Each structure stands twice: as C-alpha cells, then as structure tokens.
Swiss-Prot record:
Top-level taxon of the source organism: Bacteria
Record gene name: isaA
Keywords: Glycosidase, Hydrolase, Secreted, Signal
Pfam family, one: SLT
Lineage of origin: Bacteria, Bacillati, Bacillota, Bacilli, Bacillales
Cellular localisation: Secreted
Family the UniProt entry places it in: Belongs to the transglycosylase family. IsaA subfamily.
Designated name of the protein: Probable transglycosylase IsaA
Length: 243
C-alpha cells in the first residue's frame, strides 16, 4: 500500500491499482462512449473497492465527465488503471501548490499489484493454519496432570507398613518399658506411620513428630527411634499430647 499526499483540500477520493491486461491504445472521452456515468459515479462514491479490484474493461480508455458538481476521471493504459473524483474545478485551483508536500493531506493514492494480492491471500492461509496450536497446549496439560499423579503415588510409598509399625512399637516398648500398643498409638496418631511427615506449622518431623525446627528432617527410622527414646527419658510421656 502506497499513500501519496496531494495539496488540494477539494479532492475526495483517488484509487490506482496495477493490473495486467491486453494493451489497447484506443482512448475515448466519456461523451464518445456509451457508459453509465451515474453508475460509475456511484461506484466511486460508495464502492471504491470494486474500482480498485479491476479496470472498467480491457484495453486503454480515458473517461472524464462532470456529474452532480463533481468531476470524475477513469483512465487506463492497458496495464495500470486509475480513477478519481474531485469537486469540479479543483485541479486548476490547486495547480500552483501541487508539489507542496507539507500541505494538509486530503487525498490518498492506493496502489496494489497482483503480487501484493497473492501475498495477502497467502498471509490469510497462514493465519488459518495457526489455529491448530491450542491442541498442543491441551496435550501438554494432560501430560502434566499424569506427571503430578505419578509423583503423588511415589510419595505414598514412604508410609510405613503396619507390620513395620508393630516392629517399631515393640522395640520402643523394650527400650522404655511403655507398652507396644501405646507406642503404636503415638505413631499412628502423630504421623500416620509416615517416616517423612512434616508439620508445616510447628516443624515437627517423622514418625514421632519430634520438634526441632527442621534439624530432624532426613533422619532414618532408627535415628528417629533413638531420638524418641531420648525425649521420653528426659520429658516422659508428657512429650506427646494425649498419651
């Protein structure tokens, strides 16, 4: 798209479009041809796209007429064509300032070639193909959900089995003199048998939910048992609420 600024404030519209056609050097004035002046004037006023799309007919022509106070001009050399309309007499009024590109723009010249039309069509096709993109995004979401599920499954395997809890409770009973059933109740109540359980608010960790602001994190089950025995020997059953 190329825009050309004209100085005249009376020009209303101007379109120029490139087009390949069979050359015909015969030219005719509007008065010499049987053309529908009213129809051409209506196209210029209300449907300029049709005039930009193709010439009036093949070959060279030159139609110029005045209708309704406007002067209309339609020309073609057989390869390119142009059309415009202005208030009658506007050209002579602005001939002295036609080169003044600083004047207020009132007319735009539009130039379109066949290559540009094809380029625009190709661009439209590309935009349609791009609609397929959301499918890839949907698949990605599904894969993410599957990954999340797998992670949760892995986390649940850290829960200590019932037989292991019984064995831990029996060892704690032997080392402290407190019954295995009581130690089993503490383990199930405090951590549900999860040796890696962490209380987000207090920082308590492991099977016995030992307090220590994180220093117990990563301890083995045996280390947790040793620490629990130490806490019991120092603080007694009161170290665990609702013994």
């Amino acid at each position: 798209m190329k825009k050309t600024i004209l100085a005249s404030s009376l020009a209303v519209a101007l379109g120029v479009t490139g087009y390949a056609a069979t050359a015909d050097h015969n030219q005719a004035h509007a008065s010499e041809e049987n053309i529908d002046q009213a129809h051409l004037a209506d196209l210029a006023q209300n449907n300029p796209e049709q005039l930009n799309e193709k010439p009036l007919h093949a070959g060279a022509y030159n139609y110029d007429f005045v209708l309704g106070g406007n002067e209309y001009t339609f020309t073609s050399d057989g390869q390119t064509w142009s059309w415009n309309y202005t208030t009658a007499g506007a050209q002579s009024a602005s001939s002295n300032t036609i080169q003044d590109v600083t004047a207020q723009a009132t007319t735009h010249t539009n130039e379109t070639s066949a290559n540009e039309v094809r380029t625009q069509q190709q661009s439209s096709n590309t935009e349609v193909a791009a609609v397929e993109a959301p499918k890839a995004s949907s698949n990605t979401n599904v894969q993410t959900a599957q990954t999340s599920t797998s992670t949760k499954s892995t986390t649940t395997t850290t829960t200590t089995s019932t037989s292991s809890i019984d064995a831990i409770a029996n060892q704690m009973a032997e080392r402290t003199g407190v019954s295995a059933s009581q130690w089993k109740g503490v383990i199930q109540r405090e951590s549900g048998g999860n040796a890696n359980a962490v209380n987000a608010s207090s920082g308590a960790y492991g099977l016995f939910q030992l307090l220590g602001h994180g220093e117990h994190a990563g301890m083995s089950v045996q280390d947790q048992m040793d620490k629990a025995v130490e806490v019991y020997n120092n603080q007694g059953a009161g170290a665990w609420v609702a013994w």
